[in-house]
Amino acid sequence: MPKGEGKLIAQNRKARHDYSIIDTVEAGLVLQGTEIKSIRNGRINLKDGFARIRNGEAFLYNVHISPYEQGNIFNHDPLRTRKLLLHKKQINKLIGETKNTGITLVPLKVYIKDGYAKVLIGLAKGKKQYDKREDLKRKEVDRQISRTLKNNRR
């Protein structure tokens, strides 16, 4: 695999359905020994996760990393708060953006890049119910169009 490309481990599809993503930021994760082993095995769940900025530092909450099977007594707490590694400018930008009401930080993807676990954090605004329905209708229409084009080519 060429340097710079990441191997996708987990994706938060629910976040793209529930939120409209305004901007994304790549952040590193501070992990314990058995956590990275579990992540490499793909045993991570981003579904209920979110990020917050506290005292000038970014933290990731409610991301479940399953205990490593061979970890015995050295295993970690699956739902512990994990620190995100960001530059000060990025943190200040996120602080300014999240002061707006209705804007939150959600994890979108976790991947391994150059041997390090990275998380793609999305600056997100919650969708209303009618927005979700509209998106589903649009996807269904696109699917039908692609199906008819595919059938016409045959």
From Swiss-Prot:
GO molecular function terms listed in the Swiss-Prot or TrEMBL record:
RNA binding
Role according to the record: Required for rescue of stalled ribosomes mediated by trans-translation. Binds to transfer-messenger RNA (tmRNA), required for stable association of tmRNA with ribosomes. tmRNA and SmpB together mimic tRNA shape, replacing the anticodon stem-loop with SmpB. tmRNA is encoded by the ssrA gene; the 2 termini fold to resemble tRNA(Ala) and it encodes a 'tag peptide', a short internal open reading frame. During trans-translation Ala-aminoacylated tmRNA acts like a tRNA, entering the A-site of stalled ribosomes, displacing the stalled mRNA.
A Gene Ontology biological process annotation?
A: trans-translation
Zinc-finger: is it a keyword of this entry? no
Recorded GO CC terms: cytosol
The Swiss-Prot or TrEMBL record describes its family as follows: Belongs to the SmpB family.
The protein's name is SsrA-binding protein
The keyword Cytoplasm belongs to this UniProt entry's keyword annotation? yes
Q: Which UniProt keywords apply?
A: Cytoplasm, RNA-binding
Q: Where in the cell is it found?
A: Cytoplasm
UniProt cross-references to InterPro entries, sorted A to Z: SmpB, SsrA-bd_prot, SsrA-bd_prot_CS
Source organism of this protein record: Enterococcus faecalis (strain ATCC 700802 / V583)
Q: Which Pfam families match?
A: SmpB (PF01668)
Indicate where this protein is primarily found.
cytoplasm
